[in-house]
């Protein structure tokens, strides 16, 4: 080894001597003719093993410089020969020889190291949408499968593309933001074994793809001189390299600002730039702009500063300051005013008396920078003595201001005196405002309607001696000697408000002979005609006051502004596929009866299959029904056929419209209405929703064996079936066995009796509320408004499945205390939303209010809402003022929260039925939810997904059942 090295040294010296000897005789080489140096060994790559010698010689006649590059490191050597006696893996890299002309040659050296296959620079940064290099060059080029792998065996993203280079590393193409914090290894196979480098954590610098988001703490500021002005601008972007600054428009002055910044996550950067002027002056007023920019673009936002030398108050009357109002009417005096600083004292004054109530003052806007306020004085049922000057005063720390309203009360004339004077004059004195006019009339006899005018001989006008702005007194006289016959003189005083009359009856000595025949006949005719008119009017009034039968359910066709447009049910098509032969119906007992019709239990033969019979409910009209009632029942049939089937509504099964009175065939619900069911179950209610109380429930049911079941006669809507022996199943087993949605008749008597003997628990109540919400959500998806949702209108069938119905035809609302007479309608006031009571507005949101009342009924086990409170003016007033019922005894806190949201005074803040379903789903047990889902999947018709009505409705109004509001001004 030493001999070879010595020979090599000798050869190098010899070559140098030859160059020195020949160099002086050769001409100099120009840069244009220069050539790059020659490296020995003459290879582009050199592979050595760790510990071997690296000897590189740069052959060039002039000065040379060696540079060694690996990763981001560079070493230099100004010798022509680069010698590394014991090579290490870190000596792997590119060796470049450069001559004095700047020309260079290079060789890449690999130093194989069995323990170090990769040279690693663990810092790994990449810019979004650009390429980045994973610096893991190889020390041995003779490996395979040089690639990237995820840490801990995780796969790399499918869209990650890379290009390997043994000398530089692996280039990741088109870096994405999703690669941020991606853990990677460089991987290669050597001699059949996979080798991994140290791990890299890729940090991605996001690219700007949008302008910064800029906002300010307030859009405008109003300050007095000397106060501090502070405004904060918030800049949001993906990176801290975003630029921002405060500028004042039309001012080159540099503004002093402070910064505070932080990162919220990897690509959410937020900066706050706060501008402060410690003591403002009037000339500081102007527009300040917060400007931010990145490589994508710029954005800005402005705030306005107004500086005043002192505070101010400006008052703006919203009505004329001179007000005329009729006696007994109401008037509101309204002002708007601007006040800065905030007002400290406000008051209304009348005749040196300060009002302590009847007025309200509030800011016009909830905006923090609002300086505009509203003050209203409410004067109710003004008397004639309450005219005068009403003054509004307001003040703040700097200034005070006021405005006066002059109120005149218009009063109907009042005749103060009417006398016969000693000189034969008749005098009439009247008072009123505006000034009354007095006219005189004469008629012969004792008539009370005189028509012949008489001119007065003396008229005097004087102001009243009462309080200011009071009545004006007018005096008028006539000479009675001008009248030659017995008669009546009328003094009529009138103005714009009304009129009043007084009469003078007098007789002269001569008597006028009355007609002996004509007058009695005329009087008799008038009396008879008057009585007949009165009788006709009474009969007409009673007929018009009689509640008319109509379909409660309304289907919305479209919404125009603030009005619903309903589909006229009479115009809906009727599909004769629903026709069922009358002779296949066998009628039984009456389930319910009302003023217009009744519901009868019946057996239908061959309704589904020719060899089956099933129990159904049939709606029909009474023989005394009018044409309007017949049309209403047909409309109800068309609405039911339009809605289609759903598990939680009483579904249409068929109809008979040909060859006789209209019959509507619907599902039969064995337990009757939910209200009576809850009341029957009060004594056996278990305050738990865990089904592991089944044995306790059965034991309790044995103690209450006399409790009514589906065969009891106490409920008007029950199936009469003979009792059978059976074993009582658990409630969950009973529900699983129910085949809801199938119309095929089967013997359900044992199941019905079993279900009714089961106790009632909290899980049942939650299930009922959940099912009714599902049914109402279905109706809302069909644009249908119920308008009478209550426990009495919910039926219960086997499996404790609830079904929503409309009892309008078969309920005796005349004798039902839940329905209050208003106009020509009887309405369930305690279940109605405020907008329905006061404005006749029926919407999806008013149904949500009624649902909240239904929940209160449900969790009070059938109690009447607002217990002990009659429907009177006090009730209406409490509803207006936001009175709501307390939580019923058995309601969980979550359910009472739902009730309160249903009773929100703002209809838009009430939840939709779809949202209510989602809220209750969180309360019911998994088994109940699973059972209900299974029952829904067994439904014979595929139910369409429920559409949230809040997507379509803006809580607009409609005139519906009654043509007049339920509450007028005199009611409260």
Curated annotation (Swiss-Prot):
Gene Ontology BP terms: actin cytoskeleton organization; cell chemotaxis; cytokine-mediated signaling pathway; detection of mechanical stimulus involved in sensory perception of sound; digestive tract development; embryonic hemopoiesis; erythrocyte differentiation; erythropoietin-mediated signaling pathway
Residue ranges occupied by any Protein kinase domain in the UniProt entry: 585-933
Binding positions (ATP): 592-599, 619, 667-673, 792
Pfam families: ig, Ig_PDGFR_d4, PK_Tyr_Ser-Thr
Gene Ontology MF: a single term: ATP binding
Catalytic activities: L-tyrosyl-[protein] + ATP = O-phospho-L-tyrosyl-[protein] + ADP + H(+)
UniProt protein name: Mast/stem cell growth factor receptor Kit
Taxonomic path: Eukaryota, Metazoa, Chordata, Craniata, Vertebrata
């Amino acid at each position: 080894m030493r001999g070879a090295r010595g020979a090599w040294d000798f050869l190098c010296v010899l070559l140098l001597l030859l160059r020195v000897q020949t160099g002086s005789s050769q001409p100099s080489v120009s840069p244009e003719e220069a050539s790059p140096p020659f490296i020995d060994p003459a290879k582009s790559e050199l592979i050595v093993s760790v510990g071997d010698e690296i000897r590189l010689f740069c052959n060039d006649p002039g000065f040379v410089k060696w540079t060694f590059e690996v990763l981001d490191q560079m070493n230099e050597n100004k010798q022509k020969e680069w010698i590394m006696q014991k090579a290490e893996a870190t000596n792997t890299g590119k060796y470049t020889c450069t001559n004095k002309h700047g020309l260079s040659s290079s060789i890449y050296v690999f130093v194989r190291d069995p323990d170090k296959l990769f040279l690693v620079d663990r810092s790994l940064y990449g810019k979004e949408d650009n390429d980045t290099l994973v610096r893991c060059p190889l020390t041995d080029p003779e490996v395979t499968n040089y690639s990237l792998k995820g840490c801990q065996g995780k796969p790399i993203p499918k869209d990650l593309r890379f290009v390997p280079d043994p000398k530089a590393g692996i280039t990741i193409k088109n870096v994405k933001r999703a690669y941020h914090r991606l853990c990677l290894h460089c991987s290669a196979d050597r001699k059949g074994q996979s080798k991994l480098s140290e791990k890299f954590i890729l940090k991605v610098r996001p690219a700007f793809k949008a302008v910064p988001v800029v906002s300010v703490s307030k859009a405008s500021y109003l300050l007095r001189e000397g106060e501090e002005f502070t405004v904060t601008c918030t800049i949001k972007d993906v990176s801290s390299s975003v630029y921002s600054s405060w500028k004042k428009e039309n001012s080159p002055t540099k503004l002093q600002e402070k910064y505070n910044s932080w990162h919220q996550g990897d690509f959410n950067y937020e900066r706050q730039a706060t501008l402060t002027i410690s003591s403002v002056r009037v000339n500081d007023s102007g527009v300040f702009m917060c400007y931010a920019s990145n490589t994508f673009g710029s954005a800005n936002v402005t705030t306005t500063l107004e500086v005043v030398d002192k505070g101010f108050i400006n008052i703006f009357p919203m009505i004329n300051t001179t007000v005329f109002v009729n006696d007994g009417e109401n008037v509101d005096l309204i002002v708007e005013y601007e006040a800065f600083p905030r007002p400290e004292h406000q008051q209304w004054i009348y005749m040196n008396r300060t009002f302590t109530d009847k007025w309200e003052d509030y800011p016009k806007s909830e905006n923090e920078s609002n300086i505009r306020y509203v003050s209203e004085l409410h004067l109710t049922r003004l008397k004639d003595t309450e005219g005068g000057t009403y003054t509004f005063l307001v003040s703040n720390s700097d200034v005070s201001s006021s405005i006066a309203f002059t109120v005149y009360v218009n009063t109907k004339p009042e005749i103060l005196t009417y006398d016969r004077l000693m000189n034969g004059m008749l005098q009439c004195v009247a008072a009123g405002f505006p000034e009354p006019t007095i006219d005189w009339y004469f008629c012969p006899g004792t008539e009370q309607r005189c028509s012949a005018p008489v001119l007065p001989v003396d008229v005097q006008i004087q102001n009243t001696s009462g309080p200011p702005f009071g009545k004006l007194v007018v005096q008028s006289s006539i000479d009675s000697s001008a009248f030659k016959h017995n008669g009546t003189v009328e003094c009529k005083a009138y103005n714009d408000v009304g009129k009043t009359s007084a009469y003078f009856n007098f007789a002269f000595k001569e008597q006028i002979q009355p007609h002996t025949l004509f007058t009695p006949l005329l009087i008799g005719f008038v009396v008879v005609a008057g009585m007949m008119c009165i009788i006709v009017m009474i009969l007409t009034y009673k007929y018009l006051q009689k509640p008319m039968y109509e379909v409660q359910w309304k289907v919305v066709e479209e919404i125009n502004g603030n009005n619903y447009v309903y589909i006229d049910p009479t115009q809906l098509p009727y599909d004769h596929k629903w026709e069922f032969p009358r002779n296949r119906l066998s009628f039984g007992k009456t389930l319910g009866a009302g003023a217009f019709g009744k519901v009868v239990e019946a057996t239908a033969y061959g309704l589904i299959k020719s060899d089956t019979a099933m129990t159904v409910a049939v709606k029909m009209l009474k023989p005394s029904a009018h044409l309007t009632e017949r049309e209403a029942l047909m409309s109800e049939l068309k609405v039911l056929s339009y809605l289609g089937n759903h598990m939680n509504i009483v579904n249409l099964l068929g109809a008979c419209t040909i060859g006789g009175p209209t019959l509507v065939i619907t599902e039969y619900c064995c337990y009757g209405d939910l209200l009576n069911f809850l009341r029957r179950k009060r004594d056996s209610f278990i305050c738990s929703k865990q089904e592991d109380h089944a044995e306790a429930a059965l034991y309790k049911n044995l103690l209450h064996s006399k409790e009514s079941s589906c065969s009891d006669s106490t409920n008007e809507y029950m199936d009469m079936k003979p009792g059978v022996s059976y074993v009582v199943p658990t409630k969950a087993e009973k529900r699983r066995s129910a085949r809801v949605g199938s119309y095929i008749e089967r013997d359900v008597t044992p199941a019905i009796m079993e279900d009714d003997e089961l106790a009632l628990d909290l899980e049942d109540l939650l299930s009922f509320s959940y099912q009714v919400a599902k049914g109402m959500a279905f109706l809302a998806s069909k644009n249908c408004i119920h308008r009478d949702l209550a426990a009495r209108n919910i039926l219960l069938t086997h499996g404790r499945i609830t079904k929503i119905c409309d009892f309008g035809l078969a309920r005796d609302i005349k004798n039902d205390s839940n329905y209050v007479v208003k106009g020509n309608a009887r309405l369930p006031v305690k279940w109605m939303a405020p907008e329905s009571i006061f404005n006749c507005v029926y919407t999806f949101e008013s149904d949500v209010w009624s649902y909240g009342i239904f929940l209160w009924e449900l969790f009070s086990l059938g109690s009447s809402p607002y217990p002990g409170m009659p429907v009177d003016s006090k009730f209406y007033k409490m509803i207006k003022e936001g009175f709501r019922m307390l939580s019923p005894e058995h309601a969980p806190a979550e359910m009472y929260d739902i009730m309160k949201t249903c009773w929100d005074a703002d209809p838009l803040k009430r939840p939709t039925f779809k949202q209510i379903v989602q809220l209750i789903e969180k309360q019911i047990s998994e088994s109940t939810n699973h059972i209900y889902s299974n029952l829904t999947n067994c439904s014979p018709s595929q139910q369409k997904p429920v559409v949230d009505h809040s997507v379509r409705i803006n809580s607009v109004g409609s005139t519906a059942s009654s043509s007049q509001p339920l509450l007028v001004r005199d009611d409260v």
